[in-house]
């Protein structure tokens, strides 16, 4: 006697229930993917980064009153993406401390002594909230002649003629990296600014190469240390007979550093300037017209250096901002 075949079909009611559950699961998955991918939704704290930068805003017309600039006048992009301005305040309070290092190439020609009166007048004019020190580029290091101090007499005791030996600084970019890594203060709230007096020629890369590894290391170290770097061109011993190509290469390398950090390079042609006084006067004006920018941007987890572009809509102004900034995860942002 043959038995009836076993019916593998599922009752219609049960099949209907499965379809409902499957549809529900599919909808949930689709919504989850949509929310995760949609750019309009706010980032989590782990996806946000924060950073700070020193920005200089000057009136285009010399002698004009300082411009009135608010955070609404700014457009900031970090790594090519729009960033949100979280703070914008001028450094105009006596509590806004400034730390300044004059970093002099020890291979500079001894005629630099003719600029000492201008340097002394500049240091003596600095306000009480400014601590200054003088360091010399020697064998790839920044060698301080005294401590950071608001006492002008203490600072100027460290001013002396450079050694004037060809190549004694090694590379000026080694020395800047060393200064950035061993900044002589732990005050994270102070502005940190550097004035390099050098020809900028890297003896290990005599040509202009923006990818010079020593240059790029100096820029990265300066950005991490939040330095604003300026340079005053002054020829070194052994480089006086350098070709115009090599001198121009040195100036161009210095410009790479100053533009990346929000500073400025000063030079007049290929020779030494007659006087530092106009350059130092502009530095004083810049220190008086600086702002602290705070921003929030996207970040892929770990602290990293990002490119930054800042535009200012205030008419009659010019702005210098760093081309690179350090961005930290929002939850552990560095001050």
What are the language-model segments listed below?
Residues 9-14, 37-38, 68:
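Low-complexity, intrinsically disordered/propeptide-like segments
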